[in-house]
Amino acid sequence: MVLLNALLLVVAMTAAANTVLSLAVGDTTRLAAIHGGDQMALYLDAGTPLVSQVLTADWEAGAEIDHGGEIWATEGYSVPIDRGVLAGRITDLQGRFNLNWLASDNAGPAQAAFERLIRLLGLDIRLGRAVTEHLRPGGPANPAPYYNRALPVTAPGGTIATIAELRRVPGMTEAAFDTLAPHVAALPLGTGLNVNTASAPVLAAVLPGAALRDAEKLLSERAAAPFASAGDFASRAGTILRREVAAGPAPRDFRVVSEYFAAALDVALDDQRQSRMIWLHRSLSSGTVTETYRMTLP
């Protein structure tokens, strides 16, 4: 399976490299006339089809399961382009705690799970409650901390589009954001958690009564044999926890396949560098990949 995945990745990257060259290099006269920064932006634009090819090849190899042992998750990639190199790495956003669960009408289980995650990460529980209030439908019960700033902001409540929104939460420092960010995502409300790619803190948070060591045992089991289904996860987690494992913090929670991914792209051209994050959706039924959001990184 590893060899098959590797071959599929090579095929995907070869096809994608041709696309990259076509998009980014095609008109050499035009490229010669533009600045290096503009040229790097073109190279980064070409990263989307590269990532799409890799994710589509993974879906074609097996659409029933996504896990951390697959090539897209374990290997970065780089493609030489003209005078530069485009590199990137893909992550599964469904392996993270979906903050928008906190905006549902029945958010009690999600709120409890999020508080457990905050504690497991060593963050102030008051910060966790402020995040929960930020996403509460209708907005925070006490909006004064938002209005009483040097530059007042609004907090309408409800779902958020990106986790960058967390920077508006009262008490959210850059250090706290950097600690929390790798474990959370902002996905559509009904999106489930892929238990094959979730971190130990996230798994411990969504399993009431589980300690971090229990989640780490699950990760060891998962490394040996990824969970084949939500039922398989519940059964194996139940054995470790010695109790029945329920659905989790939101409707249709536990899954073993993913739709939502992110990719960090980096291009080097001569002595210059430029980076971008892109967010993507991959159709469960067709494997078609669509870019949904992008952000240039400093």
Residues covered by each model-derived region:
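Compositionally biased linear targeting/interaction segments
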Residues: 1-298
